Amino acid sequence: MFYTETYDVIVIGGGHAGTEAALAPARMGFKTLLLTHNVDTLGQMSCNPAIGGIGKGHLVKEVDAMGGLMAHAADKAGIQFRTLNSSKGPAVRATRAQADRVLYRQAVRTALENQPNLDIFQQEATDILIEQDRVTGVSTKMGLIFRAKSVVLTAGTFLAGKIHIGLENYEGGRAGDPASVNLSHRLRDLGLRVDRLKTGTPPRIDARTINFDILAKQHGDEVLPMFSFMGSVDDHPQQIPCYITYTNEQTHEVIRNNLDRSPMYTGVIEGIGPRYCPSIEDKVMRFSDRNSHQIYLEPEGLTSNEVYPNGISTSLPFDVQMGIVNSMKGLENARIVKPGYAIEYDYFDPRDLKPTLETKSISGLFFAGQINGTTGYEEAAAQGLLAGINAGLYVQEKDAWYPRRDQSYTGVLVDDLCTLGTKEPYRVFTSRAEYRLLLREDNADIRLTPIAHELGLIDDARWARFNQKMENIEQERQRLRNIWLHPRSEYLEEANKVLGSPLVREASGEDLLRRPEMTYDILTSLTPYKPAMEDKEAVEQVEIAIKYQGYIEHQQEEIEKQKRHENTAIPANFDYSKVSSLSNEVRAKLEQHRPVSISQASRISGITPAAISIILVNLKKQGMLKRGE
């Protein structure tokens, strides 16, 4: 049976990738349908109740800069905010928030239900309809057929999901939700490369059974940060602390004595788990020299008694989980309300995707989130936004868009996935970005909001606020450039009190601000440079731009060199078999990856500079050597 409406874009899945993937084309004016197996779990935080962190906070800011939802929802739901690496340089500072699960889900659902051009329908998708290698729609469990010109699949851990607790296992997409078995079989039939990954979650503990009085308390920042560039401190709900405990030798002994009941250590689980979020049994065995591990007790919400013990993800049997929990300080009498578990699921090789997240073999079909081998809400949201944008552009047969590595962490994420693939759950770190001084949290809007405006992703209010900020930055920099202090100035004595070394020649406000001991606040406390600007975001940009000017200019020079290769496109129909001077190994890798540019080809493992030169020569010979704008 055909549904009465025909859509431009259908998004399958209502998690963090799916919600962003649905909102983006709807904001661009495309008629969009979000298909979910349960409308009550839209925006569900399936694992840890937190948003952001190192690298991840950068992604949240980027999603927000392009009109996405995650930052707004995190501001509405955040019950503890912290700026990580606050004592380090601006490139690695990152925002993190503990979130109230209920408030977060409410913020997501409210945004979805009030978005024009977006419909929501509760049904399990069981088949993706394809004609002549082109997607035409989706069919559901009840036999309903939805027609669309493009489809974004954001299935999370649901594709052939299998939950493990001890040596027992059963089908499931997450605790309490069924797996998508039929859809998994259908995707395997399409000939896409598929493998299995694994992730896990810890048991949840009843807060009423924890002795918080003997535990260390961790408060959030006193000056509360915000995720959204349009946010306000007034958006934040009540702030509450987290607590800290530790595993000990007794904990580790419980784990070691029960490894024969672990699905990981008995070979029942074959999927590879996240390297940077290992299970507690993995930590105990891999770091056998350590006699304790720090565990954060994170509240799940203002109205919930559930506590998330961050650091003891496990798939051991329930009785062993009880032994682990009760062995720790403050948790001697703690009660588990939800057991921890591991989940195995299908993911598809992201090297079979274009950088737009469209599959190379099926036109109009896009993948986003854990289906591409990533882990984390933030990585999923960034991919969902990108896939949703390009699903809309595909409908209009417009040029696709994707960010470069020098433009955003989303660009780094997508390039890593599509060029190198992954054999383990991939997460973003600042260390993955070679241009991280330019890819800071604080300038995500400067990097991406103009692009979002061109794509139709942001409203007039955001665009006006952005332009006002840019105007404030330029005006303040101009003001500081034009105010000079010289050794004969009547204000010299005042200035020398705060300068590390006395002023011996004239200097502008910008010159003074470049000094290591000088800050914007100190500078604008001096009489010649009063008053300070009220726009704190603009102040931050002024200070960073001036203090790091040399480093920033150096990175920009490197980027310009790299762009020459990035803009040298390799046509999709380029025949590597006709390039006789390439080795068989190199030719096979290029045929497998089908890079879209010389730059992407150069990042494939085993592709040498000599091979790149050969490709360039052959592109020129065949009249295919074209450079992008």
Curated annotation (Swiss-Prot):
Pfam families: GIDA, GIDA_C_1st, SAM_GIDA_C. Its main location: cytoplasm. NAD(+) binds at residues 273-287. FAD binds at G13, G14, G15, H16, A17, G18. Keywords: Cytoplasm, FAD, Flavoprotein, NAD, tRNA processing. SUPFAM superfamilies: FAD/NAD(P)-binding domain. This is tRNA uridine 5-carboxymethylaminomethyl modification enzyme MnmG. It comes from Haemophilus influenzae (strain PittEE). The gene is mnmG.
